[in-house]
A protein has these predicted regions:
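Residue(s) in the substrate-gating loop at a strand-loop-helix junction
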Residues: 141
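Substrate-binding pocket helix/loop in short-chain dehydrogenase/reductase
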Residues: 97-98, 102-110, 215
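Short C-terminal tail/terminal secondary-structure segment
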Residues: 4, 146, 234-235, 246-259
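Short, small/polar-rich loop/turn modules that mediate ligand/substrate recognition or access, typified
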Residues: 87, 173, 178, 245-247
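Alpha-helical segment proximal to the catalytic Tyr-Lys
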Residues: 126, 170-171, 243
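C-terminal helical subdomain
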Residues: 181, 189, 205-245, 254
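Active-site helix of classical SDR
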Residues: 121, 157, 165
Length: 259
């Protein structure tokens, strides 16, 4: 039980990667807060985790709203007494050429990824500093390292998370707080499934070509990364015992990006 007696907050945890991370953490002994904009889905995910016994709560949270984040994190502390792990995972994707990208959509995407990461980090650090320890994990992407067409704000935001993690690693060290970034390749989640027809239409190619020739072309084996792959990396980072591993980004992508 790598996370026995630990408390984790996972944003965007009602579905996809976040939900799998929450399940993996709970199975490893943690108490988990399912934080999500979709309150009904968050409660449903928490109910699933609670079927073996109470180990999860749902927290309705718009990560771009300061009041939502601060009250949500306070609710976690009220329920479980502490916060040991934050996984900043909430995010969206909008696909369009840069010269056609609406400014409002640019701001919305960056707010969810970067403002959300900042607000949840700040709230978590205030509790972690009191406890003299904790770990923060940001959900980056191979797009934290590479660029792709049609994804200007997403690439910008994911690069920004690496910078934030490095600052948190430096500022948090004397308080026993670590920060790292997971950089998955393409994972077959609803977020990616939505992109496939969108890119096919904008690029004038088939959906099969989007998958084979764009998404998986640079992998070593033509395979998608899985939510289980990402969750296991999150568990490794969450349960690491010292500050030896901090300020780093871990790419899990079937070799798409090698560093």
């Amino acid at each position: 039980m790598h996370l026995k007696d630990k408390v984790a907050v996972v944003t965007g945890a009602a579905s996809g990667i976040g939900k799998e991370i929450a399940r993996t953490f709970a199975d490893a002994g943690a108490k988990v807060a399912i934080a999500d904009l979709n309150a009904a889905a968050a409660h449903a995910a928490a109910d699933e985790l609670n079927s073996p016994g109470p180990r999860a709560i749902a927290v309705a949270m718009d990560v771009t709203r300061e009041s939502d984040v601060d009250s949500g994190m306070a609710a976690v502390v009220s329920a479980f007494g502490r916060i040991d792990v934050l996984v900043s995972n909430a995010g969206i994707q909008i696909v369009a050429p840069l010269d056609e990208f609406p400014f409002a959509e640019w701001k919305r995407l960056l707010a969810i990824h970067l403002d959300g990461a900042f607000l949840t980090t700040r709230a978590a650090l205030r509790q972690m500093y009191k406890q003299r320890g904790g770990t923060i994990i940001y959900m980056g992407s191979v797009h934290s390292k590479e660029a792709s067409v049609l994804k200007a704000p997403y690439v910008t935001a994911k690069h920004g998370l690496i910078g934030l993690a490095k600052v948190v690693a430096k500022e948090g060290a004397r308080h026993g707080v670590r920060a790292n970034v997971i950089c998955p390749g393409f994972v077959r989640t609803p977020l990616v499934d939505k992109q496939i027809p969108e890119q096919a239409q904008k690029l004038g190619i088939s959906e099969e070509a989007v998958v084979k020739d764009i998404m998986l072309a640079e992998t070593v084996d033509g395979e998608f990364t899985t939510i289980e792959d990402v969750a296991q990396v999150a568990l490794f980072l969450a349960s690491f015992k010292s500050n030896a591993l901090t300020g780093q980004s871990v790419v899990v992508s079937h070799g798409w990006f090698m560093q």
